[in-house]
Amino acid sequence: MTVIDEIYSSSSAIPTVALNDEAKKPVLGLGVAKLSDEETESSVLAALEAGCRLIDTAASYGNEAAVGRAIAASGIPREELFVTTKLGTSRQGFHSAQESCKESLDRLGLDYLDLYLIHWPAPTLGKYVESFEGMIEARERGHVRSIGVSNFTEDLLATVIEETNEVPAVNQVELHPRLNQAELRQVHAQHDVTTQSYSPLGVGRLIEEPTVTTIAAEYGRTPAQVLVRWNLQLDNVVVSRSSKPERVAENLDVFDFTLEPEHMEAIEGLHDGTRVLHDPMTFMGT
C-alpha cells in the first residue's frame, strides 16, 4: 500500500500531498488544454462542484480568463483552490517570465498563483534556466507560491537544479500506461520532485485497450476511472481533461476503490515507450 493509498482509504474526498516547499497540492485535478472558453467555464464549474480544487491551465491554452470567470462564479474561497498556469515559450527569459506571470494573474483575476511552470523546455532556445530564475524572483515578490517545470527530461531537470540551486516543486509530464516514465519518476523521488501526469488516458487511445476494459469490468468502473486510478497509485498527481461535465465528475470519482497489485502490474505491462504527444527535446511550444 502506498502513502497515497493510506490517505485514500480514509475518505472519498480528494486528498493532498506536500510539495518539497511544504505547499499542499490536491492529487487530482482538471486540465483545460484545447478547450474553448465555453467548454472551459462549464468544465471548471463541473469540477469544482464535484469537489475538485486543482485547476491546471496555461498561457498558451488561451483560456485563462475563462478559468478565472468560472472560479469567480463558483464562490469558492480562493484559499481552498490550487491554481496552476504555465509560462509560454515565446515569453521565456528572466524578465519576461516575471512579466508573463503577472499577465496570467490579470487574465485569471487572481492575486497569486499556487504553481507556475515552464510549459516546455525548448532546449535549443537556451532560456529555460534564466526563465526558472525569473520564476524564483516572481515567487519572492509574492506572485506565485510554488514553481516548477513541465516536460523536462532527467538531464534538463538536473541542469536547472545545478545552475539555480533550486529544486523544482513539480515536473508535469505525459504519463500513461504506454509511457510510464519509470526512470524519470525515480529521479524525481531522489530529488523530492512531485511527478504530475497529464494525458492519463493517452489522449483517449487507452480507453478501448482490452487489458484496461477487462479490469474496468471487474471493478464496475469505466476504463477512464481505472486509468486515472492506476496513475494515482504510482503516487503521481494527475490532471485529466474533458469537455463534458458528466465525464469531468466521473473521472474525479476514483477514491473509493483500489486496484489490486496484479491489476497494477497488468496495466504496467502495457508500457512500450509510446509518446502520443510532443517530444520535449524538439517541440518548441508557443
Swiss-Prot record:
E.C. numbers: 1.1.1.-
Highest taxon, organism lineage: Bacteria
Q: Which UniProt keywords apply?
A: NADP, Oxidoreductase
Molecular function (GO) terms listed?
aldo-keto reductase (NADPH) activity
Looking up Gene3D superfamilies in the UniProt record yields:
NADP-dependent oxidoreductase domain
The active site lies at Y61
Is Ribosomal protein included in the keywords of this UniProt record?
no
Q: Where does NADPH bind?
A: L201, V203, V239, R241, S242, R247, N251
Which Pfam family, giving just one, matches this sequence?
Answer: Aldo_ket_red
| Family indicated by similarity | Belongs to the aldo/keto reductase family.
Report the protein name in the record: Aldo-keto reductase MAP_4149
Query: Which organism's genome codes for this protein?
Result: Mycolicibacterium paratuberculosis (strain ATCC BAA-968 / K-10) (Mycobacterium paratuberculosis)
